[in-house]
């Protein structure tokens, strides 16, 4: 086991979990419920499980919503 190195002014929301030997850069924010298994540089905004940049999560959500919309549309076309 090892320690976690948090830079200055790091904000951890509730239920955040950080694995051993992880470094989080200064002025970073980790959103609620995030599980961190890799290092992040300064000024990071982190979220999810596993942890990713919040910007990356937003891109994933947009793609997922588009895919779900296409599935719903295709399903409606198949119904009598």
Model-derived features with residue positions:
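Structural signal for interior beta-strand "rungs" in well-ordered beta-sheet cores
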Residues: 1-53
């Amino acid at each position: 086991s090892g320690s976690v190195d948090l830079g200055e002014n790091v904000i951890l929301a509730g239920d955040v979990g950080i694995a051993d030997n992880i470094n989080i850069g200064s002025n970073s924010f980790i959103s609620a419920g995030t599980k961190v298994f890799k290092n992040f540089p300064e000024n990071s905004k982190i979220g999810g499980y596993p942890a990713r940049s919040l910007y990356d999560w937003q891109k994933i959500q947009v793609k997922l919503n588009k895919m779900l919309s296409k599935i719903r549309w295709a399903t409606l076309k198949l119904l009598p």
